[in-house]
Amino acid sequence: MIEFVKMHCNGNSFIITNDEKITKCSFEKLNQDKDLKFDQLLIYKEDDTSLKDLKIFNRDGTPALNCINGKRCIKALLNGDKPIAKNIKATVKINAYKELLDGFTYVDTTNYHIVWESDNLVDDDLENEYQKTGKFFNSDNFNLSIYKHDSDNKFLIRTFEAGVGETLSCGSGSSATAFVIFKKNPLLDKIFLNSSGGQMICYKKDDNKICSEANTEIMNKSKFDEREYF
């Protein structure tokens, strides 16, 4: 039996476990079970408080390099917080930033992000935009975030993640987008990013770091027989 915790951060959902046997399961079968469906699978060691050995897998089984919202959830879990934890902080280092053609911006948060501003966020076909962007840059190893200015220091955001699809929220995508917004609006040092899953607060922290805050929630603690998902 594999013990797990299912959590989410602004709707970005995770299965969290320290049992590596789960990697032998069919990710397709796991995601057909509503109690096990996830955006990312996180495998951590209980004594690894820095999460340096954290293993991250996308919904389609491909590995991911980083997962800010997932780490935020594990942090809340290790802190022994109640089912809903408020304003869990995370800091992201920006490894690279480059303005590209046609209004695109490349941001490296260990995960690779393409960010651009949209005039009509709600009606954008994000999957189609992701495919077109991938063809334009000849790559599928990136996440796409589009954003729109709402009012004052409030912005709307949508993110399409490689190996997952559109998610209700994305921590590294929001951090990358916040970095772009701060670059374009140097008078801002704090913004509110609203996705379909909820609100994330982002702050400037040094020249190459973004600090963010968001809530986490434990959805379920349970176990399952891995043999049913081979």
Predicted regions and their residues:
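Surface-exposed beta-loop interaction hotspot
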Residues: 98-118
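A glycine-rich beta-to-alpha transition motif near the start of alpha/beta enzyme domains, typified by
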Residues: 1-93, 97, 115-230
